[in-house]
């Protein structure tokens, strides 16, 4: 029997891409899944698709920040696994509009914080719960041409780390998914920077779900669907000046395109 049989799972941003892949995989493992997305039609389509395959899912559209209470009502009980997958791919540099920075911070960081505030009291009381944060390799490294995205993804990773180090001894398991390019609408939104850096090694959303389930089974915090990211992360930590020089070379290549 799957470890997720009859568990109650929420996946935000699940109308397509990585979120839809996670929702389908949890349902295939026997969980009841809340499919959340800002687009009601997309959320409904994914939930219906899961149902057609014999799984259990309900669409709860709307802002990810407000989904926890509605999901509890829809599930008729507690939430066992929360996948904070909704994200905002904000390009731009330091001069990006204040509204762009604020939106990226709200979606990529504060939505996770707000969900955790609502989930933690019950998880700590019962001694179990699982928080999955879809971060990005940009949260471990950076992404050229996308300052708001890179900075807020670092924030998402930092919050996931804090949750793990603070509550793991009390039964709360935390996982941070940090892929590079994934063939989703967000990759297209990355524009020429995505074409230069991400597209050549892009993977399918299902591969991200596979990596998560492998990592959860092994109790890993960092989920790296692209194994080479571990090497980049190590290089950044051991010789940051060399790493920054290499990234600046990519920046100059991108500017010359």
Regions found by a protein language model. Give the residues of each.
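Conserved glycine-rich cofactor-binding loop
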Residues: 8, 15-16
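Residue(s) in the substrate-gating loop at a strand-loop-helix junction
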Residues: 136
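Conserved amphipathic alpha-helix within the SDR
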Residues: 47, 51, 58-77
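C-terminal helical subdomain
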Residues: 176, 192-232
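Active-site-adjacent segment of SDR/Rossmann-fold oxidoreductases
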Residues: 29, 141, 162-173
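Conserved mid-core segment of classical short-chain dehydrogenase/reductases
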Residues: 87-102, 125, 145-148
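Active-site helix of classical SDR
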Residues: 116, 152
């Amino acid at each position: 029997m799957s470890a997720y049989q009859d568990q109650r799972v929420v996946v935000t941003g699940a109308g397509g891409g990585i979120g839809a892949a996670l929702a389908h995989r949890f349902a295939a493992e026997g969980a009841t899944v809340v499919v959340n997305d800002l687009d009601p039609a997309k959320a409904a389509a994914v939930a219906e698709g899961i149902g057609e395959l014999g799984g259990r899912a309900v669409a709860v559209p709307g802002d990810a920040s407000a989904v926890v209470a509605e999901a509890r009502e829809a599930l008729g009980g507690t939430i066992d696994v929360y996948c904070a997958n909704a994200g905002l791919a904000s390009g731009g540099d330091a001069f990006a509009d204040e509204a762009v920075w604020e939106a990226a911070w709200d979606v990529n960081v504060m939505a996770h914080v707000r969900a955790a505030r609502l989930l933690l009291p019950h998880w700590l009381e019962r001694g179990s719960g699982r928080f999955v944060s879809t971060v990005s390799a940009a949260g471990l490294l950076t992404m050229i041409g996308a300052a708001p995205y890179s900075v807020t993804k670092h924030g998402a990773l930092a919050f996931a780390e804090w949750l793990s180090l603070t509550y793991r001894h009390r039964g709360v398991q935390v996982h941070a998914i940090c892929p590079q390019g994934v063939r989703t609408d967000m990759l297209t939104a990355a524009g020429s920077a995505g074409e230069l850096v991400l597209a050549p090694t892009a993977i399918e959303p299902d591969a991200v779900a596979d990596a998560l389930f492998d990592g959860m089974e092994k109790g890993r915090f960092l989920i790296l669907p692209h194994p080479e990211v571990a090497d980049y992360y190590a290089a950044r930590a051991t010789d940051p000046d060399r790493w920054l020089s290499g990234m600046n070379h990519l920046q100059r290549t991108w500017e010359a395109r």
